[in-house]
């Protein structure tokens, strides 16, 4: 947009797969007298929600990631949800110099090889087992292990047929719903948060921290 021209042998764009913001056409939004923010265009300065009544519209990726942070600060938080979502804990860990030097750099080749041949390009060891060929106890143990590890490994590393066999998918979808019932103590609220209209993995998998 500055009129510059650049030539290169290779071009790698790192803008992400969803780079254009979508501001919904909500009646009265632009005449609203209070503060409002869009997660795709967040201000550089810190936003203070302390003691305020806050509403978050949407429980997509940005919603489930921002809601817990806002809830810690706001005096009252209301969430407007259209569609209940499957969401997996991220289990983020600190990336420090020791981690990079001792765990990442020595294993570059292996990490890249895993990503090259894995479904979706994630450096995860793919499972060769079907969710339907193991016992219920083994299946639950696998899901619990994946849940504890967090991230996309839960989907891509648990069983090979979660996105190709509806019966297999039903087992993981129900496991996630059981986790929601376990975390959300109010049964009525939990019921509203249970995704039932689509299989897990059929929409973009959401990764959260303390949602």
PLM-predicted stretches and their roles:
Residues 37-51:
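A short, basic/flexible loop-to-alpha-helix module at the beginning of a structural domain
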Residues 50-60:
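Beta1/beta-strand and adjacent pyrophosphate-binding region of the FAD-binding site
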Residues 63:
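N-terminal Rossmann-fold NAD(P) dinucleotide-binding loop
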Residues 34, 39, 82:
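Active-site donor-binding loop signature of nucleotide-sugar glycosyltransferases
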Residues 66-70:
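Aromatic pocket-lining residues of Rossmann-like dinucleotide-binding sites
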Residues 1-30, 45-46, 59, 74-211:
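N-terminal FAD-binding dinucleotide-binding subdomain shared by FAD-dependent oxidases/monooxygenases
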Residues 8, 34, 51:
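Active-site acidic short loop of glycosyltransferases
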